[in-house]
């Protein structure tokens, strides 16, 4: 039995509130159960130095957690003067995931910066960030299209992410903190709306699992991402 009482293949409730802030071109508050992330997408009419003059755009991401997003208060990374390795890893993952479904040539010489700020953490913050980030990106791009700043849609597919793991010997979908903290194995799966794999991060803790175990987690991830894709489509009116 899972601590939450959910079935092995049952997601936490998903909520995506769009236009959560008034300034960003795209913004959402995304909730997976008690995990809540504020995501904004900001359009900048410039690109990184390595892309100047190449006629293509860029999508990048930043990630952070509010000090009391967790059970005990954590110090702000700005106060420490540097980002943790975990933060750098997650924001790179978010950026890679979004770039996998964007045609940079069609975006033109502009950059869209995604900011993911975790306001409450209960497991799956990076996957919630990716899933919410796609919606914020979609909203921002829609505004560019409406303003006739883009002639073609650069977003070629949707993307979502979910965690799966082995908890007390059973493969389960969408781990919360109580499960994630003691799971024998856990993984993050990033998939596109067409079913393609963008990234898989999987590891074991104190136990191992075989190839079939990994495939069972992937099958669960496909179930979960299917629900996320439906929530994303509803949020953006598609």
UniProtKB/Swiss-Prot annotation:
Similarity field: Belongs to the RNase PH family.
PROSITE patterns reported for this sequence: RIBONUCLEASE_PH
Keyword set, alphabetical order: Nucleotidyltransferase, RNA-binding, rRNA processing, Transferase, tRNA processing, tRNA-binding
Keyword Nuclease recorded: no
HAMAP family recorded: RNase_PH
GO molecular function, one term: 3'-5'-RNA exonuclease activity
Function noted in UniProt: Phosphorolytic 3'-5' exoribonuclease that plays an important role in tRNA 3'-end maturation. Removes nucleotide residues following the 3'-CCA terminus of tRNAs; can also add nucleotides to the ends of RNA molecules by using nucleoside diphosphates as substrates, but this may not be physiologically important. Probably plays a role in initiation of 16S rRNA degradation (leading to ribosome degradation) during starvation.
The keyword RNA-binding belongs to this UniProt entry's keyword annotation: yes
Disulfide pairings: none
Enzyme class label: transferase
Protein name, as recorded: Ribonuclease PH
Any one of the GO BP annotations: rRNA catabolic process
Pfam families: RNase_PH (PF01138), RNase_PH_C (PF03725)
EC number assigned by the record: 2.7.7.56
Reactions mediated catalytically: tRNA(n+1) + phosphate = tRNA(n) + a ribonucleoside 5'-diphosphate
Subunit-level organization: Homohexameric ring arranged as a trimer of dimers.
Residue sites binding phosphate per the record: 86, 124-126
Coiled coil location: none
């Amino acid at each position: 039995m899972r601590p939450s009482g959910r079935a092995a293949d049952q997601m936490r409730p998903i909520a995506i509130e769009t236009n959560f802030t008034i300034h960003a071109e795209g913004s959402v508050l995304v909730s997976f159960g008690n995990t809540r992330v504020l995501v904004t997408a900001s359009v900048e009419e410039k690109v990184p130095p390595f892309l100047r003059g190449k006629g293509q755009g860029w999508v990048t991401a930043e990630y952070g957690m509010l000090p009391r997003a967790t059970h005990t208060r954590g110090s702000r990374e700005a106060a420490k003067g540097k980002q943790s390795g975990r933060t750098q890893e997650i924001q790179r993952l978010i950026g890679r995931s979004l770039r996998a479904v964007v045609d940079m040539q069609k975006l033109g010489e502009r950059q869209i910066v995604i900011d993911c700020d975790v306001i409450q953490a209960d497991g799956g913050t990076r996957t919630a960030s990716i899933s919410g980030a796609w919606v914020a990106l979609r909203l921002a791009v829609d505004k560019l299209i409406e303003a006739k700043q883009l002639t073609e849609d650069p977003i070629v597919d949707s993307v979502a992410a979910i965690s799966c793991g082995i908890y007390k010997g059973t493969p389960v979908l969408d781990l919360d903190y109580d499960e994630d903290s003691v799971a024998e194995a856990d993984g993050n799966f990033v998939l596109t709306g067409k079913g393609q794999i963008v990234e898989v991060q999987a590891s074991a803790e104190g136990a191992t699992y075989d190839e079939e175990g990994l495939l069972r987690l992937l099958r669960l991830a496909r179930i979960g991402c299917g629900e996320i894709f439906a929530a994303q489509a509803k949020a953006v009116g598609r």
